[in-house]
């Protein structure tokens, strides 16, 4: 990371060609009044539509846009990991590309950082999603909050603000589904974690990437977070435990797919 840029916005993208133009316009409107140097990093996670072509076109229309492209879909953790590595800012904002996260919330996230937080997570207090997404998410958030010891309402919100050092320390944990637990991991590492309510909008284009298989992933995530909590103070143990867990998880997923 390079301190010449103050703010980096990292946005994973998967098949969001229609959302990208209005998203860039909203980002410009939110970021320009801040009067700070910024960059927008789109990570195309193996899109099969014209998302990357749209990003390339937009990079000629807007200043500060950078793009990373995966040849296949590696999922959100990998997209965030490469985004964190590429980010040059002192502050990193993450958000989704589907227009459900509102860029106008970015100044409020920065204000919360100025109050002394190292990571600020958005809370989709009034969520515009079907029950098939909201009910599992509520259960996940409650159990994760109890297990981790950090009282957040919404671990899953993509809209977050990080100080640079939090991103650097989070990189070893950005694989699988562990990106969901970055607030908890930051909390265990001694960083101050805060939360603010943020606007959440209905999806305008495309379709949700949420599927029934993610219900299984949710239960497996709970197992993972239990291992993380137990072994956070003994880093060498966590990799062996998570390795065993990954083998078990892989077996379950294969069995699930075969059904």
Regions found by a protein language model. Name each.
Residues 1-133, 137-138, 143, 162-167, ...:
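Structured catalytic core of nucleotide-sugar glycosyltransferases
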């Amino acid at each position: 990371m390079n301190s010449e840029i103050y703010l980096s916005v990292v946005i994973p993208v998967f098949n969001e060609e229609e959302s990208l133009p209005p998203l860039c316009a909203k980002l410009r409107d939110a970021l320009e009044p801040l009067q700070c140097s910024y960059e927008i990093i789109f990570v195309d996670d193996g899109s099969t539509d014209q998302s990357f072509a749209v990003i390339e076109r937009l990079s000629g229309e807007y200043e500060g846009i950078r793009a990373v492209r995966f040849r296949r879909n590696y999922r959100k953790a990998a997209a965030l990991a490469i985004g964190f590595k590429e980010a040059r800012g002192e502050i990193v904002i993450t958000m989704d590309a589907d227009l459900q996260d509102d860029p106008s919330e970015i100044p409020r996230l920065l204000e919360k950082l100025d109050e002394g937080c190292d990571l600020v997570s958005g809370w989709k207090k009034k969520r515009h999603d079907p029950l098939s997404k909201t009910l599992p998410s509520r259960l996940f958030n409650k159990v994760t909050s109890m297990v981790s010891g950090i009282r957040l309402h919404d671990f899953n919100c993509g809209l977050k603000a990080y100080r640079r050092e939090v991103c650097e320390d989070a990189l070893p944990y950005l694989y699988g589904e562990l990106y969901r637990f970055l607030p908890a991991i930051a909390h265990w590492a001694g960083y101050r974690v805060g939360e603010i309510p943020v606007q959440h909008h209905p999806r305008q284009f495309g379709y949700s990437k949420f599927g029934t298989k993610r219900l299984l992933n949710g239960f497996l995530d709970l197992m993972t977070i239990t291992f993380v909590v137990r072994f956070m103070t003994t880093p060498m143990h966590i990799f062996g435990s998570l390795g065993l867990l990954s083998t078990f998880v892989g077996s379950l997923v294969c069995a699930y797919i075969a059904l």
